[in-house]
């Protein structure tokens, strides 16, 4: 019931994805061979079919599709700790690589492989009793995750128009750049995500580094540490689908509560408690502490500061044994104390949900998803970098050589700029704006 089909694409997506499966397997007591050996069968198995398909002999197989345009990352997943748990047919890869080129992923190399991926997606979807939606892990800076990822999203959109499409998208970082053409790839991807995705959880390596460095006190964070943070959040977002809870939410409820205008579906995510590995057993958590940490700007996993904008909506998902009353009080408290950071024309704009089962090794945890206008900082930054290069037509021949047209770049650029100004418009909007317009008009007539 209510299955979610997981797709991971490109190097980044596959690394995040495989970490996510480790976390989910751990929570459901599934060992690396796919057998159940947990300690509380009724809870762990009750809704295990959200993410797993039960195969013959009681093995649980992830509903995951893994795609890439080169075999490297897939090979390392296959030889990794949980490599044997995936269905072998669900690895779909090419040999050529996309070479950080969005056009290769979207139009040439990726387009050749996409039908093979869609076949696997169809096969998995047919195995579902009542498919709720898709979750896609990818980065927007490279070629495969961004180009082929968005191609797959638009194809799935065509075929399953009424299913939720949730993405975990790693944006290029402000200071740490992996490739020069990141702004191009990211802008072209956002152009697609605005139209074809329902909910985008925005992640960013630099913000994740900061969390690892500042809060978790890791001196040299590895991508493994970063991906661990992401997977904790991913697990939190879907926990109320997978475990019984007092206040449940699913992907659609999340969307209905978080998206006031269809294009503004890019969310900041946060997670609490963030503790360094050694000090986990020393913290006693209370709901107020969780709430405080969860709303902390330093906890946001993308490089935008929520204090520079206002929240249109937000959602807080708590896990563990706690009273719903206390959760409600804390959420209300946050809204009352920081009312200037919430738009006043959406009253009670924070949704909370409570799930009884905490993550492994912690008593309580919470996941935060917020729709804040300050995320425009991120789009604005990428857009400026895009414009700087596009004005000089730098690196453009790599894209036009794959058959792209400059027009598409111009469209993507203006779509991104529209998005920024939409966020700005709602940030400045007030509840009694209509009256102001009337007054202005009257003055015009008088003069």
Curated annotation (Swiss-Prot):
Name this protein carries in UniProt: Tubulin beta-1 chain
Quaternary structure note: Dimer of alpha and beta chains. A typical microtubule is a hollow water-filled tube with an outer diameter of 25 nm and an inner diameter of 15 nM. Alpha-beta heterodimers associate head-to-tail to form protofilaments running lengthwise along the microtubule wall with the beta-tubulin subunit facing the microtubule plus end conferring a structural polarity. Microtubules usually have 13 protofilaments but different protofilament numbers can be found in some organisms and specialized cells.
Origin superkingdom: Eukaryota
Keyword Iron-sulfur: no
Binding-site residues for Mg(2+), renumbered to this chain: 70
Tissue distribution of the protein: Accumulates predominantly in roots.
Pfam families per record: Tubulin, Tubulin_C
Function: Tubulin is the major constituent of microtubules, a cylinder consisting of laterally associated linear protofilaments composed of alpha- and beta-tubulin heterodimers. Microtubules grow by the addition of GTP-tubulin dimers to the microtubule end, where a stabilizing cap forms. Below the cap, tubulin dimers are in GDP-bound state, owing to GTPase activity of alpha-tubulin.
Cofactor(s) the protein requires to work: Mg(2+)
A biological process from GO: response to light stimulus
Bias-annotated ranges (Acidic residues): 430-447
Note: There are nine genes coding for beta-tubulin.
Main location: cytoplasm
Gene Ontology molecular function: GTP binding; GTPase activity; metal ion binding; mRNA binding; structural constituent of cytoskeleton
A single Gene Ontology CC term: microtubule
Gene for this chain: TUBB1
Family classification: Belongs to the tubulin family.
């Amino acid at each position: 019931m209510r299955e979610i089909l997981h797709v991971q694409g490109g190097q980044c997506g596959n690394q995040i994805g495989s970490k996510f499966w480790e976390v989910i397997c751990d929570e459901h007591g599934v060992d690396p061979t796919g057998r159940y050996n947990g300690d509380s069968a009724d809870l762990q198995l009750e809704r295990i079919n959200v993410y797993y398909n039960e195969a013959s002999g009681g093995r649980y197989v992830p509903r995951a599709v893994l795609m890439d345009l080169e075999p490297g990352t897939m090979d390392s997943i296959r030889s990794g700790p949980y490599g044997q748990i995936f269905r072998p047919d669900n690895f779909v890869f090419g040999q050529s690589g996309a070479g950080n080129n969005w056009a290769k992923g979207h139009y040439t190399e990726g387009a050749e492989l996409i039908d093979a991926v869609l076949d696997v997606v169809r096969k998995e979807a047919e195995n579902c009793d009542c498919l709720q939606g898709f979750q896609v892990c990818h980065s927007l800076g490279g070629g495969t995750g961004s180009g082929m990822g968005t191609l797959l999203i638009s194809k799935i959109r065509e075929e399953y128009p009424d299913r939720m499409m949730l993405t975990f998208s790693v944006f290029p970082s402000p200071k740490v750049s992996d490739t020069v053409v990141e702004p191009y790839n990211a802008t072209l991807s956002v152009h697609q995500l605005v139209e074809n995705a329902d909910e985008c959880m925005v992640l960013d390596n630099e913000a994740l580094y900061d969390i690892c460095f500042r809060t978790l006190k890791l001196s040299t964070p590895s991508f493994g540490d970063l991906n661990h943070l992401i997977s904790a959040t991913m697990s939190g977002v879907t926990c109320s689908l997978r475990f019984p809870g007092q206040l449940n939410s699913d992907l659609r409820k999340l969307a209905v509560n978080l998206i006031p205008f269809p294009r503004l579906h890019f969310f900041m995510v946060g997670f609490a408690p963030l503790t360094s590995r050694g000090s986990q057993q020393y913290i006693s958590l209370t709901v107020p502490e969780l709430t405080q940490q969860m709303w902390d700007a330093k906890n946001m996993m993308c490089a935008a500061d929520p204090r520079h904008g206002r929240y249109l909506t937000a959602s807080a998902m708590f896990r563990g044994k706690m009273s719903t009353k206390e959760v409600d009080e804390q959420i209300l408290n946050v809204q009352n104390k920081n009312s200037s950071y919430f738009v006043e024309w959406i009253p009670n704009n924070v949704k909370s949900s409570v799930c009884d089962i905490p993550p492994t090794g912690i008593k309580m945890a919470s996941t935060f998803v917020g729709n804040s206008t300050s995320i425009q900082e991120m789009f604005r930054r990428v857009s400026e970098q895009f414009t700087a290069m596009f004005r000089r037509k730098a690196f453009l021949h790599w894209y036009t050589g794959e058959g792209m047209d400059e027009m598409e770049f111009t469209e993507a650029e203006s779509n991104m700029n529209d998005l920024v100004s939409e966020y700005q418009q709602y940030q400045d909007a007030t509840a009694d704006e209509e009256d102001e317009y009337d007054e202005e008009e009257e003055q015009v007539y008088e003069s």
